[in-house]
Amino acid sequence: TCALPILLAATISQERLQQQAETAGISAYTRMEQLFILTINELIRQSGQTLEDKTCGLILSTTKGNIDLLTRHTEHPDEAVFLWKMAENIAGYFHAEERVHVISNACISGVSALVTGKRMIENGIYRKVIVAGGDLLSHFITSGFLSFRSLSSRPCRPYDSNRDGLNLGEACGAVLLSTEKTPNSIILSGGAISNDANHISGPSRTGDGLFFAIRQAMQEAGTALQNISFVNAHGTATVYNDEMESKALTLAHLEQVPTHSLKPYFGHTLGASGIIESIVCMHELKQGILFGTPGYETPGVPMPIPVYATHQHIPMKHCVKTASGFGGCNAAIVLSLPEYAPFKDEDNTLPEIRCTREVRIENSSVFINNELIFHSEEPDFGIFI
């Protein structure tokens, strides 16, 4: 392997993890599996909900799982690198082999897992779902982001004019979705997933895909625009992601709602980001504090959005949490304080979906708004797509 340049990243102490794994008797598991098991065990300790309950499902969110095993010589079998094997090992520890599901959908994995868990409960598959998300730093992941020239050697600065890339992080988090309310409950009142099919690694240049996800999530939650207290956006501090998000929020008429990114605090944690950032949003709703976006000084996105570098005390009702990722995927959820149930505001003036681009396929050519953007030499091209 080649040496990587010095970069800023948020890492988990290997020494501390080893100590906790030894105490829990899970040293034989991979590092990723250890983090998942320790995190889920802590959730079980706090909530009292165990996976011995057959009405409780388990969703694991990750982008790469045990991918670090590809570049390390370990005693683990070759199949350990596959997501299904990682899930089998983790679920086996909790005796929940028949109730484990893996969500791996790039950087929206965590938010997608929450939406999936919500739908499973609504469709009567489970009464409760433990949703855990995690990813590790590895040579594979770091070199991949380096190839896109999207990493920064300094603390990331989402939405700032001087942003120059993201910081990676490793983390694991877990939440319990349940039909049973507790005094500390936050309601997952809406959720949606979309895909703009723009590029394998680049976000949409218009923001319409993320806008569709936001609009559908808000429609499901039934909350009016004026009752959204803040937006926790993906905010990676790459040029194109932050530009796209500003356009999407404007399309959704959320351009006046306080917006922030949590990436400067613990980096971009990939499959864990949607989970741990949602946990932070829950605490913000309860405490009435919107965390600042460190490093933000000068607006640097085409559509102005209110971003603050310092913490703000604001009245809380609902928040929108978004994520976007490779392959054009987008996801959004609405988190709500329980006292604002049933979330059906009378003045529900959500923006309507409108056609932003006209796509036409003629012979073997693709036109967008009457402009030729692709031509294939394959005579049956139109049939295949």
Question: How should each PLM-predicted stretch be described?
Answer:
Residues 46-59, 88-99, 122-130, 151-160, ...:
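Structural signature of cysteine-dependent C-C bond-forming condensing enzymes
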Residues 1-8, 151, 155-221, 230, ...:
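Condensing-enzyme catalytic core mediating Claisen C-C bond formation in acyl metabolism
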Residues 3-34, 65-116, 125, 141-168, ...:
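Conserved catalytic cysteine-centered active-site region
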Residues 25-26, 71-74, 97-115, 156-171, ...:
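Cysteine-centered functional microenvironments
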